[in-house]
Amino acid sequence: MSDLPNNGILVGVDGSSCAKLAVEWAAREAAGRNVPLRIVHVAYPAVGAWAGWGVSPAPLPENFVPTQEDQARKVIDDAIEIVDAAIEGNDRLPVSSEILWSSAVPTLVDLTKQAQMIVVGYHGRGALARGLLGSVSTALVHHAHCPVAVIHDAAQPSAPTGAPVLVGIDGSPASELAIAIAFDEASWRGGDLLALHAWTDADWPDFPEVEWSATKATAEETLAERLAGWRERYPDVTVRKVVVYGYPARHLLEESKSAQLVVVGSHGRGGFAGMLLGSVSSAVVHGAGVPVIVARQR
């Protein structure tokens, strides 16, 4: 991003269908931003089977390690093929790949310290339920040191022409970073920016209409102030604004149906630096059918 260290896009792969979509999305993202792409497959190192208390590990089956290495190389080779197809004709994009023998979560979290963004599939090969966020993806959206793009298996890496980038804004520091990312995304994608601001995170179904009318004007003014400087920096981006009084997750999910990408902060007005994923962001990551970028701060 324009205001973040330019260390490229990192994508974690494991051979799953979601990871393959993540690779394609990451390749287009890196090409659009003209930044390096780093493909990483983290495989748990081979160890002998544990037979019980006080018993030495059982030996590994013959050819287990070579087979595991072959499988790891295939994951990387398949990912590189996807990248080549996604950026066909662009031979200027620096692409690197590597296999790391370690535990996936701490390794990827540590790698995010040097990344501009990490891209992961919504769930990996180990997902027991297709509708659940995978353990690696969950850890990254909670603990990564850079923004995290989560790609659903229903998402299309090539977004529909004219679809906007949707960003949720609440005035928190995390949403300020989300605004920066969203403007940058909309600019290089050539799309509009749809900025949605909820006056409150609360769900107030009986809020008096006359009072909301007055409050809405104040909320619209606040949103305009939040966007003013960014609109000057990105004059090529057309901005549309939506102000609602509450139910931010519900409204973001509804608007995401016609968006190509959603950007949300890692936590909202009630959060604090370093806290876990906020309720609104969590609902969007789980419920959106398009790629979602969680604007995690360093």
Predicted feature locations:
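Structural beta-alpha unit
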Residues: 1-5, 18, 44-47, 63-66, ...
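Small/aliphatic-rich secondary-structure junction motif
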Residues: 2-60, 163-213, 231-233, 238-242, ...
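A short acidic, glycine-rich active-site loop
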Residues: 59-74, 212-219
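N-terminal membrane-insertion helices
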Residues: 72-80, 223, 227
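Active-site phosphate/pyrophosphate- and oxyanion-stabilizing loops and adjacent acidic/basic residues
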Residues: 81, 138, 228, 250, ...
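Conserved beta-strand segments of alpha/beta enzyme cores
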Residues: 94-96, 147, 192, 238-240, ...
